[in-house]
Amino acid sequence: FTDCRVLEAVPDGLFDHATEAETFAYCFQNCNMVTEVPADLLYNCTKITSVGSLFSGTAITQIDEDFFSRNTELTDCSIIFSNGKLKTVPEKLFANNKKVTTFNSLFANTESFESVPAGLFANNPEVDSFRMLFSGTSLKSVPAGLFANNHKVTNFQSAFSKTAIQSVPADLFAGCDKVTTFMSCFTGCSELQSVPAELFKSSGAFTTVTKTAFNNIFKDCTSLTEVPAGLFDGFTLVTAFNDAFNGCASLTTLPAGLFATNTAVTSFTNVFKGCTSLKSIPEGVLGGLSKVTSFSG
């Protein structure tokens, strides 16, 4: 039914006999007149592994807590509700989907999405990627422990980019010690005012992050006023902080040892470009970084 823009309703029992179906990817994508779906639509489809983009671009405003409860073989739950109308989802929506490996762009660009329950991903221990998870939503806050049981995640790229969050809990990434990238994770969070010093260190991903894991990390966070000491401590393999604070127009102070342990860094391209409130750089902020070759921008 992809792009069926005149479809207004999904009838009860539509897939009751689709017991051998393995995927419903893109099934109702861009059916922008659909505002609701039967709670038991997929109850008999116990073999499906993918629901990627299932309701992307629809006008669904709520989803039943048990909607995916019988789809225990699901692995791909990416882009399900992107470009939609949801404001939130039930905490136990994915409680029975223990094999899911990707939630990429789950709510991306759903501007109405405002809140996420703390236990939404509590029963999804196999997840590998949350790339662009909430990107472009109106998410206002991040509950503590949101990723507490997702220790296999490698990708948080752009996960919270362009959201309305004002702060993040110190334990947000705690225990996620297989992360390879945080790139652009908070890019464009224009209301983000502060970040805790333990934010990245609590993950323990010191040996798994890629060389460019922090590029664009706080780019265009226009309300961020300060950076805590020790924020990047321990990440000795990182070689670039390109655009890390580019466009942080409210940033006024930096800790002297911000990059003290990042001794492999070679590039700081545009790292403080557009930081119009930053009047001075503390002595020694770049001390000991003998491998740096680029300060352009």
Label each residue range with its predicted role:
Residues F1-G297:
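Solvent-exposed loop and capping/linker segments of extracellular ligand-binding repeat ectodomains
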